[in-house]
Amino acid sequence: MTAKELFQTVLDKAKEFGLTAKNERRAIIDPKGNAIIRENLEAPAFTDGSAFFAFISSEEEPAGQYSDFSFVIFPDDKEQVNSCVVCLGVGSSGFRNDYQTASLPGLRRLFLKLKTDKSYFKTSFEDIESTSSDLLNEIKTNNLCLRNVIESYKTVLPASQIVSLDDKEKALDAIFMWLATYAKMRAWGSAAQKRAIAAQLEKLPQPELPDDEKEINKLLDTRKYVVLQGAPGTGKTYTALKIAENFDKVFFEQFHAETNYSDFVYGLEPDTTQTSTQLRFKAKEGVLYRTIKYAQEHKQEKILLIIDEINRANLSNVLGPVFYLFEYQSGTRKVKTKVEDLELEKLPDNIKVIATMNTADRSLAVVDFALRRRFAWYTLRPHEIKVGEDKVFMKKVYNQFADIFFEYATDEELNLQPGQSYFIVEKANKNEEMKERMVYELMPLIKEYLAEGYLLKAKDSFCDLFLKETGRLMYE
């Protein structure tokens, strides 16, 4: 396939996806066109490192330097293309209208769906100063014919993939995936053309949902102590209790701001059974002490301790010296920790611990690095779910929230996305129940996020969603 043939093939597919050319070479032929087509595929361009073709913003000129995002392909040869680099590029004039788009995490997530072992992505798509060094190193090592052109544009390629044309059909399919993603970003086309874009993107392999229970059980086997973290509604406590069904004995404790060492481990409390007028105290066995005693007395049993909302308490005050017992590999350490009448180097081998942590509650205690090292951390993500016959999962509403978080949430803010439990309602009254849940549970939650300074760029999208689905204004 020649470079010109590759260009024409990609252009034809772009028109199927809704591209309407505004120009033909330097002449404007359709002022309402949604893209400017650039093409430099003559022989000298392959010598001086300037061979490419691109679909750029319709607001740019047919020639000269340009701004903003573009779909670009750099072929390696004029007469026989052996490989090419397909890119989301930025014009050498930088950003003019696309900076806001570049700043949204959703754009990078959109293109990351195209990831292969030959694709390269900058951490920030706003960055047009640093070099795409991994791409450049790969080109220098294995694709010398493309070295000059990639060297010329090495700072303005936020997303790229090296495509080999050894298998022409496979190569074109990969290129069309990138083209469809760019078309989706630019919102090209009629309803029918958007369906063509969607059909192309549906060919992408879908990530498999993790088997949370299986993965957590594996962690318990290897690490013993696991924290389940996630946003409200992701099923942290439910999952812990589900896993608990496989244990012989389960102990459960929910932490709160006033939880202390004597509550969790061991202490004293007033003895109210005495008739004497003199105040007397008796031993107060905390749940950890009781768990240890039981484990020592029942060495053949599997014991699980569940600590719900572990970061609601001041962990230094709650754990004290027993902090050192939560060590899944004690090594040669022989220091004993005293817990009332017990002296331990570590927790008994038949005890495992699951703690839960709400990542959305920003008022909670910070978990220090020493505790993080002692526990394995497993994140429960929101996901679609199958429910019983009398209930229904409100997939449409769930996806509307998921789309907003995908588009606007930073990596940290993704931990705030409401979980699937919010979207499970009774089948008999599903619409009314979902509306009430949005008004009285989800709207206050989102307003709290916004008040704390999170997801501010998504504010208008949330306002529109709540107004559309409930008829209620988020802000009067």
Each model region followed by its residue ranges:
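Amphipathic, interaction-prone secondary-structure segments
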Residues: 32-76
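A short, conserved, highly charged catalytic patch centered on acidic carboxylates
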Residues: 20, 46-51, 91-94
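Histidine-centered divalent-metal-coordination microenvironment in nucleic-acid enzymes
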Residues: 68-74, 83-87, 421
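C-terminal regulatory/interaction module of P-loop NTP-utilizing enzymes
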Residues: 184-476
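Acidic-basic catalytic patches of nuclease active cores, encompassing PD-(D/E)XK
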Residues: 2-44
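Residue-level detector of short, conserved catalytic/binding motifs and their immediate flanks
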Residues: 51, 67-70, 84, 224-226, ...
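Compact, glycine/acidic-enriched structural inserts
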Residues: 78-141
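Long, solvent-exposed, polar/charged low-complexity segments
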Residues: 1-17, 132-200
